Amino acid sequence: MAVLKPLCPLLLLSIICFGLIRSEANGPKVTDKVFFDIEVDGKPLARIIIGLFGKTVPKTVENFKQLSIGTQLKDGRTASYKGSTFHRVIKSFMIQGGDFTNHDGTGGFSIYGDRFPDENFKLRHVGAGWLSMANAGPDTNGSQFFITTVKTSWLDGKHVVFGKVVEGMNIVRQIESETTDSRDRPVKSIKIASCGHIPVEIPFSVTNSDAVE
C-alpha cells in the first residue's frame, strides 16, 4: 500500500493562500471599466476608475457606459457625464452625480428614454465604494447614480447596484469631505471634467467588501 507523503510547508502555504484569495474575490465580475477625471472649482484633482458588472446587470451597465463615453440618442439629444457635477454629498453615506441637464438632482435621462425599469436587485450595498442607481422610486432609473462611502444595507432591494470603485477611492473620500450647504450641495463645484470607457479583456471578480483607498 502506498503511503502518502506529507505536503512540504511551502506548497501547503501556497494552497492556503490561493484558497484565501479565491474566497475573498468571490463578488461579481467586472466586465468593463469607466474613468472619471475630477475637477474641484476648475482645478484638477485626480481620476476615479469604476468596475462595472456587465454580466449581472447588463442593461444598467450599458446605460452607464454609454453615458460615460458620450452618445447621441435617436431623438437627437446628446447624453454625457462629461461636464456634469456631483450635486449631492453626504458624509458617511454617499456622493451623488449624473444629472447632466440640470446639475441639481432634478434632471438627466437614460439611453433608453427618460426612465427605465429596475433591472434586478441581485447585488447589495455591502460597503464603501459601490456604485448604484439613484431613483425617485421603483422603475425610475435615468442617469443619476451614487457611490457609497459606508455600507448602506437599507437601500438593498430599492436601488440597483452595478459597479464598484477599483481605483481612486481616496478621491471619493475627498469629495465626501467637501463642505456642503443645508441641502447637501457642495459649496465648491465638483465636476467630471473628462470621462470614458476602459475595455476589460479578461473579466475579474471583486471582493464583497469596502473598496480599497
From Swiss-Prot:
The keyword Signal applies. It comes from the Eukaryota. One of its GO terms (molecular function) is peptidyl-prolyl cis-trans isomerase activity. Its main location: endoplasmic reticulum. It is found in: Endoplasmic reticulum lumen. Residues 1-23 form the signal peptide. GO terms for biological process: protein folding. Inhibited by cyclosporin A (CsA). One of its GO terms (cellular component) is endoplasmic reticulum lumen. It is an enzyme of class 5 (isomerase). The keyword Electron transport does not apply. A motif (Prevents secretion from ER) lies at residues 210-213. Its EC number is 5.2.1.8. Belongs to the cyclophilin-type PPIase family. PPIase B subfamily. This is Peptidyl-prolyl cis-trans isomerase B. It comes from Schistosoma mansoni. The gene is CYP.
